[in-house]
């Protein structure tokens, strides 16, 4: 299931009674701050999980069309590790 920030804001608005515009601004601000923090360092959201940017080193590879060796450049990957409470919630156990 894919959910948009607008849908999250609409759910907040109906649940809390705030205006939809205010809730959209809150959701946008929260996600923007999470992204900014996660770019710089490991970010852990208690009872949810951790986001961390990992640097992948360059490595040798093969061009599938020409079979020639190539170097795959380094890149950054975002890694998410769910918390044990989130895993338990998904798997149906209550802890």
Curated annotation (Swiss-Prot):
Any single Gene Ontology cellular-component annotation: cytosol
SMART domains: BHL (SM00411)
Keyword Iron-sulfur: no
Molecular function via GO: DNA binding; structural constituent of chromatin
InterPro entries associated with the record: Hist_DNA-bd (IPR000119), IHF-like_DNA-bd_dom_sf (IPR010992)
Pfam family of the protein (one): Bac_DNA_binding
Cross-referenced Gene3D superfamilies: IHF-like DNA-binding proteins
Keywords: DNA-binding
Family as reported in the entry's similarity comment: Belongs to the bacterial histone-like protein family.
Name by which UniProt lists this protein: Histone-like DNA-binding protein
Organism encoding this protein: Rickettsia montanensis
Lineage summary: Bacteria, Pseudomonadati, Pseudomonadota, Alphaproteobacteria, Rickettsiales
